[in-house]
């Protein structure tokens, strides 16, 4: 399947010369993601509180540091060695480092240097379509969603101006506006501040006025997705969060995790347990 494959480029109807792909799968091949997952399956961390998360060709190293640690430790060296042994080149320019620390007096994290190049330290990073910031406020993610929604209002208003049937307008709203708001919804919506939440609620209210019919509120959509996701975890023994859902001796209610901070209280597991117990 991989041996002797050729490829070429087409620009304005003209084709380039054929070239042989010597060490990669054909671009656009439906098997390429699966083959890459199989190839990188053995890349995993055995270090305590150090995890290597992979989704297709996106790889993230997550480290839980104690009060005296300021670096990822040996997991970085292990990952670089694995890349070298697996004939994979790490693009240092695209590699970013972000430290999430809620303490007021934050120690400066150690600088990461790979092949003589310093890895850029950032305050926010877009991972799998969602902006994460170093305080987990999701403000940048909310601003990005709001900006995209504003751009799509133009098309929705055009449909209203042309007196398109409300059924088609609702279909457009759910496909191009609601879908971008509710993407990875259960991860961040409950953690939003009132200002950011009102910003997204305004998108729904403006859309409802343009369509002429009220649309489902974001809180209702969030609870539906949260309930569905929590139930899927409860029926999947292999899910990493399965053990976080523990039933009380009565067997009818789940044990609510003790939350010292509002940040943890509004995170996924406590929110899901509260909803399931309601």
Segments and roles (model prediction):
Residues 116-186:
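Basic, alpha-helical interaction scaffolds
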Residues 33-63, 180:
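Active-site palm subdomain of RNA-directed nucleic acid polymerases
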Residues 23-33, 65-73, 89-91, 118, ...:
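Conserved, non-catalytic sequence blocks in retroelement Pol enzymes and Pol-derived host proteins
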Residues 12-15, 89-123:
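Short, conserved micro-motifs composed of acidic
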Residues 59-84, 102, 137:
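Catalytic palm subdomain of template-directed nucleic-acid polymerases
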Residues 28, 43, 52, 57-59, ...:
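Mobile genetic element proteins and their domesticated derivatives, centered on retroelements
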Residues 190-278:
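Short linear motifs embedded in intrinsically disordered, charge-biased segments
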Residues 1-26, 63:
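Conserved pre-catalytic core of RNA-dependent polymerases
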